[in-house]
């Protein structure tokens, strides 16, 4: 069997998850609603810059446990096939981890394809994630996180 790797229609069917999940907007709306509630009710540092380029921000949700020293760090990179969604849609993932003693970092990045003046591709996003992890390594202790346990 040969896969139709160069058939644009086949590629569109395989990589267009929105078409495969007709009620995807219900999920997006629930994520956004639940995430807004999380940001309103648990301690967090929002829109912290890890760089100067478009999309280079992150949200930090410190551990709910305040004793026992530095805590492990969970870094969450949101999905969206590199072209949609935002870190603010995914704050809902933080509470179970912060309650279990983790510091949670939800990272944003520029979305493909960008603009004509500032194009974005997947290698660009990979470099942004390297930059974000560097920020976490150097700065997370200020939020109670333990850099060796990212």
Language-model regions, residue ranges each:
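A fold-wide structural signal in alpha/beta-hydrolase
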Residues: 73, 98-110
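Catalytic nucleophile-loop/oxyanion-hole region of alpha/beta-hydrolase
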Residues: 85-93, 105-148
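Short beta-strand element of the alpha/beta-hydrolase
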Residues: 69-80
